[in-house]
A protein has these predicted regions:
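Short, basic/aromatic recognition patches that contact phosphate-bearing ligands
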Residues: 1-48
């Protein structure tokens, strides 16, 4: 999965969730580090 696909999935997960989703949980889901998720979230925030 590339960065763009992962970010789209992260955004979808966050939109569907009724409560906050920990970065650690997303990192485990996508098999990346928590720091990668934090960077992805920064990109998502900057683009919205």
């Amino acid at each position: 999965m590339n960065n763009i696909e992962r970010r789209k999935e992260i955004l979808d997960i966050l939109r569907k969730s009724s409560s906050p989703v920990p970065a650690k949980q997303l990192a485990a889901r996508f098999d990346v580090s928590r720091q990668v998720i934090v960077q992805d979230l920064a990109v998502i925030r900057a683009s919205t």
